[in-house]
């Protein structure tokens, strides 16, 4: 997910996006723990997307 796509969303949409990313991260972590996750880079990508969303939420709260 690109930061430019996220910047166009408001805080409520970013909150929903964060919630869905956290659920996805949990699912991927469970798959990794049970050794069902073939592509482990997905976990890193989701973690970085979460960081992007949280950064934008912080920036929007400061304005």
UniProtKB/Swiss-Prot annotation:
Keyword tags: Ribonucleoprotein, Ribosomal protein
Protein name as it appears in the record: Large ribosomal subunit protein uL29
One annotated GO biological process: translation
Pfam families: Ribosomal_L29 (PF00831)
PANTHER family: 60S RIBOSOMAL PROTEIN L35/50S RIBOSOMAL PROTEIN L29, LARGE RIBOSOMAL SUBUNIT PROTEIN UL29C
GO molecular function, one term: structural constituent of ribosome
InterPro entries, alphabetized: Ribosomal_protein_uL29 (IPR050063), Ribosomal_uL29 (IPR001854), Ribosomal_uL29_CS (IPR018254), Ribosomal_uL29_sf (IPR036049)
Cellular compartments per GO CC: cytosolic large ribosomal subunit
Transmembrane domains' residue ranges: none
Family: Belongs to the universal ribosomal protein uL29 family.
